[in-house]
Amino acid sequence: MNYSGVRETEVVVAGAGQAGLAAAFHLRRVGYEPDRDFVVLDHAPRPGGAWQFRWPTLTYGTVHGMHALPGMELTGADPDRPSSEVIGAYFDTYERTFGLRVHRPVDVRAVRAGADERLLVETSEGTYATRALINATGTWDRPFWPRFPGQEVFRGRQLHSSAYRGPQDFAGQRVIVVGGGTSAVQQLMEIAGTAAATTWVTRRPPLFREGPFDEQQGRAAVARVEERVRAGLPPQSVVSVTGLPMTEAMRQARARGVLERLPLFDRLTETGATWSDGSTVEADTILYATGFRAAIDHLAPLKLREPGGGIRLDGTRAVRDPRVHLIGYGPSASTIGANRAGRTAVREIRQLLRPDLRTAA
C-alpha cells in the first residue's frame, strides 16, 4: 500500500468489535490478506470493541449472552474478573492469532462514492479507495438521551449508562433509573445496594422471560427486528423483543422491591420528577439507561437512509448500494448474530468482486 496518498484495497472493515473481527476472520479464511486485500479500522484505543468500556463491576460471570468469535473459543475465564478485561484480552489474542492487523485508533469520518466504482473511505490515517465496505461500527459512540420537560432545571446530576462506573458513585443518593433493558436492570440492582433510595421508571412495562430461550423463539425475535430493517425503519434492539431473562439475582431483587417499576414521569423539576397524577419523587441523580443508536453518520454522503429513517437491508447488503454491508446492525446486533452476519457479508462481497465465484460456497 502507498501510505503517502490514497490507498487502494478490495475491502475496508470499519470496526473491530465482535462483528468486525468475525468478518475479518472470514475474509482471511477465503484467501484475502490483511493490509493487502483488506484493512480493518477501529476507532477504539485497544482491542475489545465496546466491551472495553463496560463498567468495572460487570463481571464476566454476569455477562448476558457473550458468544465466542469464529474459530476460537473463550475458555477458562475467571467469572469474577471484569468483563472488559476478559473480553478485551480474548479479542487481543484473537487478533494476534489470526494476524488481522487492526489499525487503531482510526476514526472513519466519511464514506463517499469515488471513481471506478470504488468507495472513498476518509479516515484519520488517510483515505482508502475500496471496492466494498463492511460497516461494523456498532452503537457505543451514540448513546441515546431522551428529552423530557424540565431537564434543564433539574439541579442534580444526569448521566447516561455508558458513563456508569459502579455503585460507589451513588452512595447515599436518591437515584431514578430510566430504561427497561439489561443494563438498566443490572445497574439498578447494583446501585440499590449503596443508594439511599432507587426508583425505576420505564416507558412500557418490562417483559421478564422465564425459562430457556429456544432456537425457534430466537428466530422469531430476530425476524421481528429484521422486518423493520427490511422496511427501512430504524432497528429495534433484539432484547426489546426477546425480553429480559429472569435470573436468581433478579428474583431476589424483585422480592426486595428493587424491581418495582413506575411508568415514565411527565417532567423533571429542580429536585426530582413528577407525574400527571401529582405524585413526585425526589432525586439527586437521573441515570438514563436508554440504550444506543447505530453509529452510521459517516455513511451519510452515500444517502442510504430510507424515508423511515433507517437503512434498508437485503441480508447484510444495503439496498441502495450493494457495495456496503452493515453487520452488528438490527437483526445481527447480538454476538451470535454478528458472527453469522460477518460470514454472510464476506460471502456476498466475494461474489460481488468475483462474479465467477457466484455459484461457489
Residue ranges and their predicted role:
Residues 2-45, 49-50, 79-361:
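Flavin (primarily FAD) cofactor-binding/catalytic cores of flavoenzymes
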Residues 46-71:
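Redox-cofactor-proximal catalytic regions of oxidoreductases
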Residues 66-73, 228-233:
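Short, basic/glycine-rich phosphate-binding loops at helix/coil junctions
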Residues 73-79:
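A short acidic, helix-capping loop that chelates divalent metal ions and anchors anionic groups
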